[in-house]
Each structure stands twice: as C-alpha cells, then as structure tokens.
C-alpha cells in the first residue's frame, strides 16, 4: 500500500517524498524535493551479499519538466545524497510520450540514470572491508543506466483507477563486471489500484 497527497504546489508520497513546486507556467515546471531511496539490497538476499550492509537514504532533488508538444514531455532530475550514506550525486533524464491506443492511455518512457562514482559504488561496488572468498574489491566508477517503461491506467469509477506498468533496466559493462551483479538487465511489473479521496 502507498499513500500520497497532492495540492497545487505541494505533494507527498512514499515514492517521491516531499516535493514543492515553485514554478509552473503550463509548459515548464520546476520543483524541489526530499526523496527517499530504499536500500538497494539486503545481505540476506543472497550468499554473494553476505556481510554487505546498505541502508535507505535520502536525496535532495531538483526536478524540471518541459512540455515539448502535446503528449510529449522531457524530464530532468538532479539529486544529491543528504544522509551521508555515500555522499553521491545522480541525475535522471527521460522522455515521456502519452499515446491513446484504442481509447486506452499508454505512457512510454525512455531515459537514463547517471550515478557518480560514490553512488555507483554504493549500489554495485565492493569495498575493501567487504572482500570475501566469494567476491573481490570492485569500484565501478561513474555509470549511466538506460531504462524503458510502459504504463497505463483504467478508471473503474470516479475515485478508483486500475494501473499497471512494466519497467526494463539495462546495465553497462562496468556494472555487469561487478562480482555482486549477475545480470545484464532487469525487469519488473507493477499492478495495483489507486483510490482518490
């Protein structure tokens, strides 16, 4: 379950944190937020991760969006980690295209996330203190991770929507070469109900 609150300038949600929109002229919008990031993994997920500790952290983020044309929007988010878990920076650049197909709204997104070396190491690296017989020390350096997603929603009544999404993430060679990464890509599916009060 997830709860969110949205007004003209302020939004609060588990996924995006606390955001304040301080500019919006209908074409360009600019907002600042404090965004939570769940721990990338737990050591209990795999024997390959035994002894490796990662925690939830928070970013200060500047979000900019630009409505390029009807249904086409560009988004840029630039973030800096605030909780000193890794002191890393990141950015996310994407294009969103809204297309109605047989009356069903479909949103296609293509983008890329950039992580500086500190952030990439927190997600995919192995520190000297984490070396074991199963893994060697590894620092991926800064990295760029392309992604694609397809999302849709369907109104059930005036308050309730059914939503679904498919997400694909692609890992570059400096991530794939990490001893704790076993795949070149990942995929996820989300299906749920959204209720508006």
What is each stretch, according to the model?
Residues 9-12, 28, 70-74, 103-106, ...:
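Repeated loop/turn-to-beta-strand initiation elements of outer-membrane beta-barrel proteins
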